[in-house]
């Protein structure tokens, strides 16, 4: 763990001279209310292990573009209306994600840094799952669209396993379009994990896994966005089968 934290720290230090001369290009921030509805098959098959029950959550989300690169992050408060130590699946949980792309000049390539964590304490038994990615990315962008793939090494710090944990190849993508006078955005994030450590793989469906979501957003006004997402995961999230859900969302944009 120390080696990987040192790598991330050095990367941040090297970026400081660039950040100190950064020009802010734009950004966004929002607060949203979301409800994740797992398919009945997913809930039934996960009832003895990962307990995937439907849940609502509050999310704070934001991103910013600079001359040196870009940042994105969110913080989710899941089952905020329940107790911290409720039974598994209905307990409060806390999840965050942060991604950074540090541009490598004008090449289109970027240094990709990614941190993710989720935490809970069902029945007063603490659980955590942290993931750190460091690798290389590339930005493809055009008028109203973007496709940003990455390839990264992964380190996991989890309740049941800590150590190097293979690789992740993935992307974020989006497309803005109009239907009549209404503004819409179609987005997708996707992560393919492979060459996982054998210990981790034993509890997560094997050496490979898939995780992601496809979303359609209606930008109703400058301050209100609603959306519907199809959430999917295969050999991931503590299970060895395909899991899916629909997420209903409404966000207030600052």
From Swiss-Prot:
Q: Give a GO cellular-component term.
A: cell outer membrane
- Any Pfam family from its record, for instance, is Channel_Tsx
Under the heading InterPro entries, the entry gives: Channel_Tsx-like, Channel_Tsx-like_sf
Q: What domain of life does the native source organism fall in?
A: Bacteria
Record's family?
Answer: Belongs to the nucleoside-specific channel-forming outer membrane porin (Tsx) (TC 1.B.10) family.
Protein name (Swiss-Prot/TrEMBL): Uncharacterized protein YfeN
Task: Name the gene that codes for it.
Answer: yfeN
